[in-house]
Amino acid sequence: MKTVSQISELRAQVKAWRQQGLTVAFVPTMGNLHAGHISLVAEAHKHADKVVASIFVNPMQFGVNEDIENYPRTMINDEQKLTAAGTDLLFTPSPDIIYPKGLAKQSFVEVPNISDGYCGESRPGHFRGVATIVCKLFNLVQPDVACFGLKDYQQVQVIQRMVEDLSMPITIIPVATIREESGLALSSRNGYLTEEEKAIAPALHQSLHWLGEQIRAGYAQQDSIDFIGLAKHAAKTINDAGLHTDYLHVCHAETLQPASEDDTQLVILAAAHCGKARLIDNLQVNLA
C-alpha cells in the first residue's frame, strides 16, 4: 500500500490508474479503524480494480461541544489494517491541505431536509461538515464507486442525495453493519465504554429488534400500527437498561420522513448515550 498526504500525489496515482483503464473504489474514514471499516474495503474490492482509502479527522463535522482533540488517532495500526486488507492507496491529508483558507472561509455543501432531523438535530452542522468533506474527497479521488457503512444510515442517505442532486458519476455502495456477538454495532465510539457500560449497550439494538418484530406482526395481521407509541415503548426499554435515549423514530427508508401505514420500506433510527459514548444504530424493516 502506498500512503500519500499531498493532493498532487493522490491525483497523479489515480491518473496513472485511469490511463491503464482501471476502475477506482473509495473508502473515506476518520481513522481509528475496526472490522466495520475493513468490511468496507473488502466490499470495495468487489466493485473496482483499485481501492483508495482516506484517513482525515474532519474538523467541520465536529460541534462546539465535541472535542476533536480527543478523537482517537491510531495511524500506525490503521495503516497496518488497511495494508492487510489489500488497500492500494491511502490518502492522509492534514487540515491545512483540505481547508487551506480555514473553516470560516470554506465553501460548504448542505443537503436540505434529509439532514435536518435525528443526528442533524442533535448535532447541528454535522451533516454540512460530512457533505462538504465527502464532496471534496470525491472531487479529489473521482472514484467510480464509494463504500459507506449502514450503521450511519442517515449519513448514507445524505451522501446518496448529494450525489444525485449534484449529478456526480459515482455509485454509492451501502455496506451492512458489522456487530459484536452481543449485537452491539462496531463503532470507534465503543472505545469509550467501560466494561459495565459495554454489558448494557446491546439494549439499544435489542430494542430496535423488538420494535421491528412488533411492526412486522402488526402488518401481517393488517392491524393499525402505532409507530409513535411503539417507539416510545422501545425508548423506555433502552432507558430502563441504563442508557439515555437521544432519539428513536420509525421512518420511511428513503426520505426519512415519519412512517405512515402506507409505507412498506421502513427504517428505525436511534441514538442513545451510554456513559461518555453516544451510540447510534438502525434497523431496516421491509414489509413488501
Curated annotation (Swiss-Prot):
Pathway assignment: Cofactor biosynthesis; (R)-pantothenate biosynthesis; (R)-pantothenate from (R)-pantoate and beta-alanine: step 1/1
This protein's record includes keyword RNA-binding: no
GO MF term list: ATP binding; pantoate-beta-alanine ligase activity
GO process annotations (BP): pantothenate biosynthetic process
Disulfide bond annotation, renumbered to this chain: none
Binding annotation for beta-alanine: 61
InterPro entries associated with the record: Cyt_trans-like (IPR004821), Pantoate_ligase (IPR003721), Pantoate_ligase_C (IPR042176), Rossmann-like_a/b/a_fold (IPR014729)
Subcellular location, record wording: Cytoplasm
Positions bound to ATP: 30-37, 149-152, 178, 186-189
Principal subcellular localisation of the protein: cytoplasm
Gene Ontology cellular component list: cytosol
EC numbers: 6.3.2.1
Active site: 37 (proton donor)
Binding residues annotated for (R)-pantoate, in chain numbering: 61, 155
Enzyme class: ligase
Domain of life (superkingdom): Bacteria
Catalyses which reaction(s): (R)-pantoate + beta-alanine + ATP = (R)-pantothenate + AMP + diphosphate + H(+)
Signal peptide (UniProt feature, chain positions): none
Remaining remarks: The reaction proceeds by a bi uni uni bi ping pong mechanism.
HAMAP family, alphabetized: PanC
Similarity remark: Belongs to the pantothenate synthetase family.
Main function: Catalyzes the condensation of pantoate with beta-alanine in an ATP-dependent reaction via a pantoyl-adenylate intermediate.
NCBIfam families, A to Z: cyt_tran_rel (TIGR00125), panC (TIGR00018)
Entry protein name: Pantothenate synthetase
Native source organism of the sequence: Colwellia psychrerythraea (strain 34H / ATCC BAA-681)
Lineage, broadest ranks: Bacteria, Pseudomonadati, Pseudomonadota, Gammaproteobacteria, Alteromonadales
